[in-house]
């Protein structure tokens, strides 16, 4: 079985790799981490992202057609974690180019190799700015380029799934993601709170 992680060197991906190695991988299974950055390079989570035995690290840009050498199996699963996600902080076209083009290329790769399972990490951003309680039935009304790009990427994945009833798609819309090695808003808020105690 192949566990194929696009964007596997990011915060979620590195924790997922640790979990897969600990709980899921059997002899003969392979984890592929396909990302623009590799463990030990600038831009990855220090202290969390290190090279792991049993993981094949491949430098890859999801904005371009995807192809790499591997032996597909019927059980393979893709984790599509690749994204430009900090908002604000990037030109608008960066969100669309990476998040939308990336979704097109990942689903084309899955189609080419007959991979029937994708887990796509979206965001709470497609819901838009609102203080209302969010549910799976809440109408998405994104109001940022990031939110729009993630909603379109969800639709690209849903179209891929709709083409074959044997395909399985899970879309996750996390709110705030935090934990060991994360240096975003929750960590900054926590540090400010501790400084004033």
Please tell me what each predicted stretch does.
Residues 104-145, 165, 170:
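Conserved Rossmann-fold NAD(P)-dependent oxidoreductase catalytic core, especially the SDR/UDP-sugar
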Residues 149:
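Active-site helix of classical SDR
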Residues 3-26:
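N-terminal Rossmann NAD(P)H-binding glycine-rich loop of SDR-like oxidoreductase domains
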Residues 6, 34, 78-82, 118-124, ...:
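SDR active-site strand-loop-helix element
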Residues 161-171, 175-196:
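NAD(P)-dependent short-chain dehydrogenase/reductase
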Residues 25-41:
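Conserved glycine-rich Rossmann-like NAD(P)H-binding loop of the short-chain dehydrogenase/reductase
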Residues 59-101, 109-112, 127:
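NAD(P)H-binding glycine-rich loop region in Rossmannoid oxidoreductase-like domains
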């Amino acid at each position: 079985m192949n566990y194929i992680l696009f964007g596997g060197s990011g915060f979620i991906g590195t924790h997922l790799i640790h979990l897969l190695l600990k709980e899921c991988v059997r002899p003969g299974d392979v984890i592929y981490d396909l990302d623009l950055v590799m463990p030990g390079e600038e831009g990855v989570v220090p202290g969390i992202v290190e090279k792991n035995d049993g993981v094949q690290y491949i430098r890859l840009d999801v904005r371009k057609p995807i192809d790499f050498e591997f032996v597909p199996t019927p059980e393979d699963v893709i984790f599509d974690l690749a994204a430009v996600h900090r908002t604000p902080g990037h030109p608008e076209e960066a969100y669309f180019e990476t998040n939308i083009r990336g979704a097109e290329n990942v689903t084309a790769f899955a189609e080419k190799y007959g991979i029937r399972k994708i887990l796509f990490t979206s965001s709470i951003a497609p819901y838009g700015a609102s203080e209302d309680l969010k549910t799976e039935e809440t109408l998405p009304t994104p109001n940022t380029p990031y939110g729009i790009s993630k909603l379109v990427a969800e639709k690209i994945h849903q179209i891929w799934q709709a083409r074959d009833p044997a395909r399985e798609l899970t879309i996750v819309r996390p709110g705030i993601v935090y934990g060991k090695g994360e240096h975003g808003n929750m960590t900054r808020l926590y540090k400010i709170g501790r400084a004033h105690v």
